[in-house]
Amino acid sequence: MKEVKSIIAGVVATGKVGDYILYQRLGVPCIRRASTKKRSADSYTETQRIGQSRLRYLVSLYQALQPTVVKRAWQRARKRPGQTGFNAFVSQNYAAFGKDEVIADYSRIKMSEGDLRLPLGIAVAVTGPRELMLSWDIRKDKLLGEATDCLYVLLMDGDGSFRTVVKEETGVCRGDGRAIVALAPGEGLPEHLYCFWASANGCRFTPSWYARIAWQ
């Protein structure tokens, strides 16, 4: 049994999704492996059905991101005793999904969590037909971290498919102050950008930062 810290005020999300069951124990949301017993779909409440749908799509999103640095970020995130990176990802991203089984608010998706701080003044601008520039303040009192912290950028489509391009080898550090993000030939124009920084040894992370891209 794994505990999941809920961030949904007034919503009790329970039900079976794939190999997992989301349930409440002493008021604490938990996840455990599902048993082989069958349960009639008619026996679920509407709240449980919504919880099932959200968890199903959260699992799909996590699986899509597993091959990337996002998995390591959540493994390193501060968690409750016994909580896995997957549990932490679910609890922090549950509220981003709506009743219609899609991401309702992309700004509430968290691609990383950690104890490092984001630099101040982060901004994104469209600088070409297929190019973005990400910038941030590098003055000493604004940098809020080591100049050697590595930048990671994620670009996500807005069609609910979870198609995400992860720029893991940006070669850009916190001390550089800006990064040019060029789309590869054949890549569609993403609607959503997430970025975060990791320490040079890859053991500590910042929370992720989000922006919607306004292509011209």
Where are these regions (language model features)?
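Long, polar/Ser/Thr-enriched low-complexity segments
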Residues: 1-120
